[in-house]
Amino acid sequence: MPKSHGFRKNTRDKLKKSVRERGISPVVRAIQDFAVGEKVHIIIDPSIHKGMPHPKFHGRTGTVVGRRGRAYVLEVPDQSAKKLVIALPEHLVAQK
């Protein structure tokens, strides 16, 4: 069989919810608000496909640079480069 080149390839464990997290995500997570300059963690919610950043960025921390519609534009360091990642608030968690 040919190798898959899809967006979610090699994510069997990365995009898996634990038993206690299964089911519908809370609405509070969708209406979070982040200020520009705030640090956020990218934690992908696999049950919500819209606005999902690339799985490569799962677990990374970035800085909010701006908004694009309902989504946030984040600046995430990737080795020596800085990448812009667009993600909906459902996939973001504020850094404490």
Swiss-Prot record:
Q: Output this protein's name.
A: Large ribosomal subunit protein eL21
The family note in this entry says: Belongs to the eukaryotic ribosomal protein eL21 family.
Kindly state a single biological-process term from the GO annotations of this entry: translation
Keywords, in A-Z order: Ribonucleoprotein, Ribosomal protein
Q: Does the keyword Ribonucleoprotein apply?
A: yes
One GO cellular component this record assigns the protein to is: ribonucleoprotein complex
What gene is this protein translated from? rpl21e
Q: Which PROSITE patterns match?
A: RIBOSOMAL_L21E
Keyword Metal-binding listed? The answer is no
HAMAP family, sorted: Ribosomal_eL21 (MF_00369)
Q: Which residues form a coiled coil?
A: none
Q: Which top-level group of life is the source organism from?
A: Archaea
Molecular functions per Gene Ontology: structural constituent of ribosome
